[in-house]
Amino acid sequence: FLTYGLGLREREEYDFQAADLGNVCHRALERFSYKVEREAGDWLKLTEEKRKQYVEESVEEAIADYGNSILYSSSRNAYLIVRMKRMLEKTVWALTKQLAAGDFKPSAYELRFANGKIDRVDTCEDGDCVYVKVIDYKTGSKSFDVTALYHGLQLQLMVYMDAALQLEQKKHPEK
């Protein structure tokens, strides 16, 4: 009677999943980028201590946005948060090294267009040309596959690049 008559069932318990980890990491990286832009102005000017501080703050802010009572509800989740901070420190270090090795500079973060959002757009101005690079943050291990692109199975980055190019052309109509 309780199950069929009243429709009672066991309460579902929330469990922090891989998708949640990806969402929090993504939000933390977004917050980190805005902090750098606002407070330091340039990724390459950050000291290692500042970079670690920004990562720590960004993760904590992203967790608060997500509902920190849930994320700190178990030892497992607390461990995942520590792991997430370490992973983001390595990610930010690698992204900084990539910027240092080239002439591209971040131009836009969380760039919204039609029905999507580009995580980051980097640009490099060279004379009368502007080169554009699209960065899509992923926590998984998916890699770019030219064959899948050719067969229309992996179009997201191409759509993002087209949108970024159109937006940059509006910014730099003379180039």
Regions found by a protein language model. Give the residues of each.
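Short acidic (Asp/Glu) and glycine-rich catalytic loops that position anionic groups and cofactors
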Residues: 2-9, 37-38, 61-72, 135-143
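Short, well-ordered alpha-helical packing segments
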Residues: 2-3, 26-33, 85, 89-92, ...
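Short, polar/flexible loop-turn hinges at active-site or ligand-entry regions and domain interfaces
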Residues: 8-16, 38-44, 169-171
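Short, charged/polar micro-motifs that form catalytic or ligand-binding hotspots
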Residues: 11-22, 74, 78, 146-151
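A non-catalytic, helix-rich entry segment at domain boundaries
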Residues: 28-113
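Short helix-terminating capping/connector loops at secondary-structure junctions
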Residues: 101-104, 170-175
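Non-catalytic protein-protein interaction segments used by genome-maintenance enzymes to assemble
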Residues: 106-168
